[in-house]
């Protein structure tokens, strides 16, 4: 690997081999050649003067791309598609004269992009399901484990660790639903000609529109698409790119939210992401256990959310047909969006697969604040015993402020002692201690977790079947 030129960190550090291969020059230009073969085959089968031998020769040279020839030709003609038509013709000379017959550049560029994007989305779906399976197992394990809740990042009523995980998982489920919609609604461009009129193919087939439709149907089916866009210009509608980057951005939003929560919880040592035996947290502070994976998820997710802004700007400025100035943006923003989403989900898998809960710290943190959280129940019990609700509310406020001030000086919380010593409440310390059971304050968290997981089982069953250790 050369070290004297820039290389995107998405390629060198973060993305998977699958995604790197999917958006590689080999995959892109081989897909172009597959499209040229499919076009020639359909034209031959529908009666155009193309021989089976020409089709076979094209098919025999899909993978042996001479990049040196193509690059030299592009330098001369300044056109990538025509450069590859030329290189393909050199490899398959008997078919050189019929390559790209009737087509325009977007026949190969746009249809190839749609194939790669669809395959990329399907791969990301698998990665997303894996994250959800991990979270489902984690949520089930800790469905009933109380933990301190937060609002405004201030202590609030308890929840359970599993309930918190289902909130993350619910975001990812929303992404999965959106992803399935985008994949299911993808269409092929087909053979549309320079402005989408199919005029060149109408001419080739001597006005037989049915043959043009059949040609499009056959080529689309060969690449796994059931339908083509009903109408288009030379390019497929760039709103499709917006849909794709929007769903990738949505995944990034969910991942960022989860990873940011984990970072906050790791600060208090309640939860920790995986930490390798020989991992170094800081070059200057050897004791550090930085949440590196979660930080990286947030960093890459931020990039992906920003990257998604490219697609709507492209879709909204077509100028009657796509301008070349926009094509350059797409060559960067879409592949990098896929690579970034891949990296984010791989990191999410790593974190959720080894997320560790320090249960003693979770319990200690909750019990530190539990006296304050229990005051509403204490107040209601005191009212039952004849107290005045408004007077008791004020007394609890005063005692709470005093106890908090004491805690700020490093002293333990003495709120329960203060309430036990106040005759307005008429309760002993032993009676107050009995309401300090955390599970009294988690409401229906456990039932909510289990119900949510039951809803998700149909979505996760296929992914979970690959791992017998996961009980859904």
Name what the model sees in each region.
Residues 20-24, 69-71, 279-299, 321-336, ...:
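Short beta-alpha connecting loops at secondary-structure transitions
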Residues 1-202, 207-218, 281-282, 292-296, ...:
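A helix-coil-helix interface module used to build multimeric assemblies
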Residues 235-270, 274, 279-340:
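A conserved active-site cap/scaffold subdomain adjacent to cofactor or substrate pockets
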Residues 78-81, 92, 128, 132-135, ...:
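Alpha-helical transition-metal enzyme core signature, strongest for iron centers
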Residues 140-162, 272-288, 321-329, 353-373:
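Glycine-rich cofactor-pocket loops
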Residues 303-389, 395:
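Long, amphipathic alpha-helical stalk/connector segments used for oligomerization, subunit docking
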Residues 272, 395-401:
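Active/binding-pocket-proximal capping segment
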Residues 209-234:
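Active-site-adjacent "gating/activation" loops or surface patches in catalytic cores
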